[in-house]
Amino acid sequence: PQQIPDHEILCAGFPCQPFSQAGHKQGFNDTRGTLFFQIEKIIRCKMPKAFLLENVKGLKGHDKGRTFQIIIDTLEAIGYNVKTKILAAKDFNLPQNRERIYIVGFLNPQHAQKFEFPKALEKTIRYVMGRTSA
């Protein structure tokens, strides 16, 4: 982590296969599932003002929620105020039905308090496509 340049915001994802419906759901027992802890090391070393992590929505319920709770507890123990939400790409006019969990954290509790996840757009991709075809 020391070789990574300092930064104010960390955006990262870790392999989803260990937590995915399509995968074998081995979680932290799958080597790929432990890559979250590499992200944790970077966060601990660099202490960015904020981070954004994303993964499959199945992460939240994996191992009856224990895996997700370990992740949240780990990030909060470092000193971050953490918020999470499942968002669907289709709700933001992207042509795919893909739900992901987003985990955001802020060192400053006031920033966390002000942060709001985006709300679904009212116009659907079907609406947009219908308006552009002639």
Which positions does each model-derived feature cover?
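Class I S-adenosyl-L-methionine
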Residues: Q2-I9, C16-A134
